[in-house]
Curated annotation (Swiss-Prot):
PANTHER family: ACYL-[ACYL-CARRIER-PROTEIN]--UDP-N-ACETYLGLUCOSAMINE O-ACYLTRANSFERASE, ACYL-[ACYL-CARRIER-PROTEIN]--UDP-N-ACETYLGLUCOSAMINE O-ACYLTRANSFERASE, MITOCHONDRIAL-RELATED. Involved in the biosynthesis of lipid A, a phosphorylated glycolipid that anchors the lipopolysaccharide to the outer membrane of the cell. GO terms for molecular function: acyl-[acyl-carrier-protein]-UDP-N-acetylglucosamine O-acyltransferase activity. The gene is lpxA. This is Acyl-[acyl-carrier-protein]--UDP-N-acetylglucosamine O-acyltransferase. It comes from Allorhizobium ampelinum (strain ATCC BAA-846 / DSM 112012 / S4) (Agrobacterium vitis (strain S4)). Belongs to the transferase hexapeptide repeat family. LpxA subfamily. It is found in: Cytoplasm.
Length: 271
């Protein structure tokens, strides 16, 4: 049985299915639908015409705008109605028309969105995506299934990300780009096909990365992408030189990690 706290404000036109968990100070505006397995954190706000379905958790103080559909079944031909989940962290904002799907059994069953994220209008997060914190998805961004995105990454409007692609921490994807391969932490990718275009120096500076550190990351980037040789071999060759630079080590670890996709590079073709 659903217990609605006295502090919650729910418009009489909205439907709250029996079994839903409503936190303190939750606001649910007109014509929303909250499914029976949905959990809404304290202080969350749903403006109007929001559909919350599936086995979905929305964190504290998150705001979801009209016509968003959160926790829908995965758009996968392999899905046969199994119960899978979606978890969204605290302080997230999902603007008009955002869609986020639950996971699939094949993908582990869980779609996860971290905290303090901003998803702008009509952006889509497909099944089994794993997103960190402080991420911005601009209008009409499309994430295919199983995509992984690190903290503080920014994706420009209309960009599309291929399934199983990894996007590293604080990377920047330009508007209308086609991101088909993994993007290193702090990398910038633009175009269709998407090509690596250097480092997100502006983002690094805003995040408080020291100028000397940025210089070292630039030096490592040149060694990785301007010199001849296989990328993994080059990553191994420079590891000792940059052992004291956490940002470079993060990039090197990303390069050698297991992945279903190749690595984005500054030139056409796979790296």
């Amino acid at each position: 049985m659903t217990v609605i706290p006295a502090s919650a404000r729910i418009h009489p036109s909205s439907v709250i299915e029996d079994g839903a968990v409503i936190g303190e100070n939750v606001t649910i505006g007109p014509f929303c639908h909250v499914g029976s397995k949905v959990v809404l954190g304290d202080g969350a706000e749903f403006l109007s015409h929001v559909v919350l379905t599936g086995k979905t958790v929305v964190g504290k103080n998150s705001r979801i705008f009209p016509n968003a559909v959160i926790g829908g079944e995965p758009q996968s031909i392999h899905h046969s109605g199994e119960e899978t989940t979606l978890t969204i962290g605290d302080n997230c904002t999902m603007r008009e028309g955002v869609t986020i799907n639950c996971g699939t059994v094949e993908g582990g069953g869980h779609t996860v969105v971290g905290s303090n994220n901003l998803f702008l209008a009509n952006s889509h997060v497909a099944h089994d995506c794993q997103l960190g914190n402080h991420i911005i998805l601009s209008n009409n961004v499309m994430l295919a299934g199983h995509v992984k995105i690190g903290d503080r990454a920014i994706l420009g409007g209309g960009s599309a990300v291929h399934q199983f692609t990894r996007i590293g921490r604080q990377a920047f994807i330009g508007g209308l780009s086609a991101c088909s391969y993994d993007v290193i932490p702090y990398g910038m990718l633009n175009g269709n096909p998407g090509l690596l275009g250097g480092l997100n120096v502006v983002g690094m500076t805003r995040a408080g990365v020291e100028r000397a550190t940025i210089h070292r990351v630039r030096k490592a980037y040149k060694a990785l992408f301007d010199e001849e040789g296989a990328i993994r071999e080059k990553a191994a060759a420079i590891r000792e030189e940059f052992a004291d630079c956490a940002e470079v080590i993060e990039i090197l670890d990303f390069i050698v990690a297991e992945s279903d996709r190749a690595l984005s590079s500054p030139f056409r073709g796979k790296s």
